[in-house]
UniProtKB/Swiss-Prot annotation:
It catalyses: guanosine(26) in tRNA + 2 S-adenosyl-L-methionine = N(2)-dimethylguanosine(26) in tRNA + 2 S-adenosyl-L-homocysteine + 2 H(+). GO terms for molecular function: tRNA (guanine(26)-N2)-dimethyltransferase activity; tRNA binding. It comes from the Eukaryota. Signal peptide: none annotated. This is tRNA (guanine(26)-N(2))-dimethyltransferase 2. Pfam families: TRM. Zn(2+) binds at C315, C318, C350, C353. Keywords: Metal-binding, Methyltransferase, RNA-binding, S-adenosyl-L-methionine, Transferase, tRNA processing, tRNA-binding, Zinc. The keyword Methyltransferase applies. It comes from Arabidopsis thaliana. Changing D200A: Loss of activity. It is an enzyme of class 2 (transferase). Dimethylates a single guanine residue at position 26 of most tRNAs using S-adenosyl-L-methionine as donor of the methyl groups.
Length: 589
């Protein structure tokens, strides 16, 4: 049965094209182009790293073979050399004929035995494919990609995906396959089969993590998105704990904490199968968080997990926070002993303002990025800018990520520090200079343009702010306010606000854009597929926010209502509020 293209709109992104039905039958979100572009960039880097690792392993395997070849060749050359006593021509000819032939055969056999095999093209699983746009872009844009398996539990989505596969031609047909099945069941029944697993659900990925971890090959790549930011950022802490096993805190760093909660949850699922993760890139963009981690199997390396997790103590009165590691290691002879961490790291009351602490976590406190990966991905993206529809955005995010302090979890907000003290804010460059002049490190964060990552302790941070307030006095406040308690103490560190050359990052010095506005209105999450689109949705969140298409049924109803209603009736209509006000005025008169 042929598809009537009049009922569809062709949407092109990158090199892929999909047919989108006007009745919102299958989910599609234009804003996720950033997500898809970033995934393609990371996947390209994964293929490159995978090839390098394979070549390195192959070279190690071929070294013994080369030594054997050299040894056989040297022995053969000795046999070929005539002795001083002399040899007859017949014997010499036989030796010369047999020697080289035997030498030439053995190395050939040895070389064949240790010949490096080319790695198989990576097999990719898109667990929740919907329209199949992501799978189609992987197949058409990434060189060397293998089979792409697209799954969905919704029959309409599978039919749409299959329709789009045919619409994209022979390359898509040969590489992409679509199945109507539960992604969890499929991943559980295909353990360690996929080199890449992509989870991009509508909401939380928590129910897919256990099966996804099992389906990734050793050294494979797991890409995971979470869009339930209200839960991850502390809006519903008990729900977050039930889904991810961590309790979130409502603070300025909540979006980075969301990333670290997701990483900790993935690590927890991996540990159940003697596996562990190595994050290569973790980003927060738009309305979601996205992590890219490699999955490895090692019972011994898995023991380091408690060293990578921490609880967070957040003061309820000021911006002070402290991290409490879950475990610690103690070297003993040639082995390592793992012990519980020593704590607590804070007193019951805050040392700075005297208020209590909230405790959250555990979160992933190890690095969220691999700097080598980030630099390589950024360079690759810049060299192929024409192939990324969202180049400006992803290059800006990667640039900021490349300048972050990797070993500093969470961050401070300069505006929040000033809000606590109720003082005017110093410039970011001045504050950074003061931290650097105190022999500490500081950087920005891709999560928040006002955020600052630093390894300076909170005592130094508050001393900097105390000295700033001394030079810029404020009005008297209630002595019970956290800001008053902090300012009542004298600084214990010398503060130097003189401009430091490192107060601006390389990107800032070159005036490279790092934080970009949304490209259009209503740039965010869209309606779930299958929901009835009404004129109310359009009036509230805009025409484009409902995938850019109103159903013909609603358009026809709207036109009929407008035609059925005479213009005189529209003019005679009175707002009930205005009518009531007018009646009250007449009564009062």
């Amino acid at each position: 049965m042929e598809t009537d293209l009049n009922d569809y709109t062709v949407i092109k992104e990158g090199e892929a094209e999909i047919l989108m039905h006007k009745k919102n039958q299958v989910f599609f979100n234009k804003a996720q182009v950033n997500n898809r572009d970033m995934s393609i960039a990371v996947l390209r880097e994964f293929l490159s790293k995978r090839k390098q690792e394979h070549e390195a392993k192959s070279s190690k395997r071929t070294r013994p073979a080369s030594k054997v070849i050299e040894k056989d060749a040297s022995e053969a050359s000795k046999e070929e050399t005539p002795s001083e006593n002399g040899m007859n021509n017949g014997d010499h000819e036989v030796a010369s004929e047999d020697g080289p032939s035997s030498v030439s055969k053995d190395p050939a056999k040895t070389t064949e035995r240790f010949a490096p095999r080319e790695p198989k093209p990576p097999k990719v699983l898109e667990a929740l494919s919907a329209s199949g746009l992501r799978a189609l872009r992987y197949a058409r844009e990434i060189e060397g990609i293998g089979q792409v398996v697209a799954l969905d539990n919704d029959l309409a989505s599978v039919e749409a995906c299959q329709r789009n596969i045919k619409f994209n031609g022979s390359v898509a047909i040969s590489k992409v396959e679509s199945h109507h099945t539960d992604a969890r069941v499929h991943m559980l029944t295909h353990p360690k089969e996929f080199d890449v697993v992509d989870l991009d659900p509508y909401g939380s990925p928590s129910i897919f993590l256990d099966s996804a971890i099992q389906s990734v090959t050793d050294g494979g790549l797991l890409m995971c998105t979470a869009t339930d930011m209200a839960v991850l950022c502390g809006g519903n802490g008990e729900v977050c704990y039930s889904k991810y096993g961590s309790y979130p805190l409502r603070a300025k760093y909540c979006h980075e904490m969301a990333l670290r909660i997701l990483l900790a949850s993935i690590e927890s699922h991996a540990n159940r199968y003697k596996r562990y993760i190595v994050p290569v890139l973790s980003v927060q963009m738009d309305f979601y968080v996205r992590v890219f981690v490699r999955v490895y199997t090692s019972a011994s390396a898995m023991k380091n997990t408690p060293l990578k997790l921490s609880y967070v103590y957040q003061c309820i009165g000021c911006d002070s926070f402290h991290l409490q590691p879950v475990g610690r290691s103690l070297p003993k002879n040639n082995s390592v002993r793992y012990l519980p961490a020593i704590g607590p790291v804070v007193k019951q009351d805050c040392n700075h303002c005297g208020k209590k602490y909230n405790m959250g976590g555990p979160i992933w406190s190890a690095p969220m990025h691999d700097p080598e990966w980030v630099t390589s991905i950024l360079n690759s993206v810049k060299s192929m800018k024409d192939r990324y529809p969202a180049y400006d955005r992803i290059s800006a995010v990667l640039t900021t990520v490349s300048e972050e302090l990797l070993d500093v979890p969470l961050f401070l907000s300069l505006h929040n520090l000033c809000a606590t003290l109720k003082c005017i804010s110093p410039s970011a460059a001045m504050f950074r200079s003061a931290v650097i002049n105190a022999n500490y490190r500081i950087s920005g964060t891709h999560v928040n343009p006002l955020g600052m990552k630093t390894d300076a302790p909170m005592e130094v941070i508050w001393d900097i702010m105390r000295c700033w307030v001394k030079n810029h006095p404020i009005k008297a406040q209630s002595p019970e306010q956290p800001g008053s308690v902090i300012l009542s103490k004298e600084p214990s560190h010398e503060v130097d606000f003189s401009r430091h050359i490192g107060s601006l990052s390389k990107a800032q010095a070159k005036k490279v854009a790092r934080f970009l506005p949304n490209p259009e209105k209503h740039w965010g999450p869209k309606l779930r597929a299958g929901r009835q689109i009404t004129s109310k949705h359009v009036s509230l969140i805009g025409h484009e926010a409902v995938n850019g298409h109103l159903s013909q049924h609603h358009e026809e109803l709207k036109e009929e209502d407008e035609e059925a209603e005479p213009e005189d009736n529209v003019q005679d209509k009175v707002d009930p509020k205005r009518q009531k006000t007018a009646t009250d005025n007449i009564t009062s008169t």
